[in-house]
Each structure stands twice: as C-alpha cells, then as structure tokens.
Amino acid sequence: MASGAKLEASHPPKAANAAAPAKKVHYPFWFGGSASCFAAAVTHPLDLVKVRLQTRGPGAPSTMVGTFVHVFKNDGFFGLYSGLSAAILRQLTYSTTRFGIYEELKNHFTSPDSPPGLFTLIGMASASGFIGGMAGNPADVLNVRMQSDAALPPAQRRNYRNAIHGLVTMTRTEGPASLFRGVWPNSTRAVLMTTSQLASYDTFKRLCLENLGMSDNMGTHFTASFMAGFVATTVCSPVDVIKTRVMTASPAEGRSQSIVGLLRDITRKEGLAWAFRGWVPSFIRLGPHTIATFIFLEEHKKLYRLLKGL
C-alpha cells in the first residue's frame, strides 16, 4: 500500500504537469476598422499636409512646417481637418476589410501552437490588402480630393461638404466610374501597405516577445508598430505619390494620361526623387498612425478578452 502511494507520488498524472494549450481567440471582424478610425482622427492633419506636399503647385510651401503654417493661416485650425469625414469613411471600408480578412485568414490557416511564417503572413496580407484597396477606393478618392481642395484656385475647387455629398456629386457629375479612379495603383499600394504594415507588425512583435524577452504589453506594441510604420512608409512611397497624382487629376487629365504616361512625365520633370517626395511627412503621419492603430487594436482585443473572461 505504501509502495503504491510512493509510486503514485513519484509519478503524478500527466495532466497535472502538462501545460494548458494556448487558446485561440476569435475577435470581431470590425476591430481593425474601429482602431483605424481612432488613429485617423488623431493623425488627420499630418495626412493632409502629406497630400498637400505631394500635389503642391508653383509657389506653394515645400516643407512640412511651411505647409502646416500655410493651411492654418489661410483655412484656420479646422482647415487641418478638411476631409476628415472621407478619412473616417475610408477607414470604415478599407481598414475594416483588410484587417478583418487578414485576421480571418490567420484564424483559419494557423494555430497558436504553430504561428505562421513571414511568407505566409505576406501572402495573407497581400490578399486582404488587395480586396481592402478595392473596397476603400471611393472613399480614398474623396479623401485625397477633399484634403487638396483648398489648395486649388477657387474656380477649380470641388467644394464637397462631406463624404456623402462628395460621393453623390462625383457619381452625378463624373459617373460611377469616377469612384474607382486610380483603383489599380491604389489596390497595389494597399497590397504593399498591408503586407509591410500588418505582416511586419506581427513579425516584429514575435521577435520582441520570443527573441528579445519583452512582455506582451504596450511597450512591445509601440516598438513593433514603430518599426512597421518605418517599413510601410518606405515601401509605399512611390505608389502613394502616383495614387495621389491620379486621384487629384481633372476628368480631362484622367482620360488623356495613362499611368505609364504619368510616370514618364513626372520622371522627366522631377527626376527619380519623385518616388520619395513627401517621405518625411509620410513617415511622420504613417508612423504615428501605425502606432495608434495597433495600440488601439491591442486595447480592443484586451478589453474583449476581459469582457469575455478569456
């Protein structure tokens, strides 16, 4: 009897020693869009300055600070938030789609015990980014137009009152096809953005947790999202410039010039430096936007787990 007890004590049941398997949590589809809306509200003035620099005409300020001062002086404080409704609409369509599909693909094809590799993440991010780019294109056209409108001569301004008014006006005056102007460069940019932002964030976060011994807290989220923002800005800069030029073109310019023609024209006039025109304001905007997006997203997830008792 004693020997049996001794044997039982020296060989406890395996279940007692086995670590509990990691539990997969299925988060709501809309979390990425919600987090991106919060981030857009915080960083919108930086996005507006980036667009103004990319589309500036002769005599317009050529620096970020100069553009800030110019907008504030001519349009007031709320001029820095011109086009905010379109920016929010864009996040509700574009970011909800790309984040949602990306997370669904991760949930379907991976498990907590077998995290996806970099190339798997890139493939999933590319697919979700392309679909998100198409879904968000109408709002993206509006966003770019509303941000750059005040920089145009009064006779050329479109004067959209808000995102809904802009959608109705564009459809009525330019036809439904105008909502998808620049859809190919925009979808290409969305692929690059989602790949360099979401896939790199997951990769940098795993590196921080597994290789650097960091805890899963806001410091880690900040570090991983900062690096993801740097990568995303550099990768997306050339396509971002092309997208902005195409979307701000007049209907006549849009019909008469192809993407190849636009590339040839701006390279001849500006040299290859056009590819990184506005990189600094792009990073100053995209860096904080990426950081804010992922921190808001992680907080969404944290609150969800708390409410669900997970």
From Swiss-Prot:
Bilayer topology: Multi-pass membrane protein
Gene3D superfamilies xrefs: Mitochondrial carrier domain
Transmembrane regions listed in the UniProt entry: 29-49, 85-105, 122-142, 186-206, 222-242, 275-296
Localization annotation: Mitochondrion inner membrane
Knocked-out gene: effects: Leads to fluffy and albino colonies, and reduced conidia formation, when all 6 genes ctpA to ctpF are deleted.
Ranges for the Solcar repeats: 23-108, 115-207, 216-303
One GO CC term on file: mitochondrial inner membrane
Enzyme class, UniProt record, top EC level: translocase
Key words, A-Z: Membrane, Mitochondrion, Mitochondrion inner membrane, Repeat, Translocase, Transmembrane, Transmembrane helix, Transport
Protein family per UniProt: Belongs to the mitochondrial carrier (TC 2.A.29) family.
Protein task: Mitochondrial transporter that does not mediate citrate export from mitochondria to cytoplasm. Its exact function has still to be determined.
Identification of the protein by name: Mitochondrial citrate transporter F
Source organism per UniProt: Aspergillus niger (strain ATCC 1015 / CBS 113.46 / FGSC A1144 / LSHB Ac4 / NCTC 3858a / NRRL 328 / USDA 3528.7)
Lineage: Eukaryota, Fungi, Dikarya, Ascomycota, Pezizomycotina
Gene of this entry: ctpF
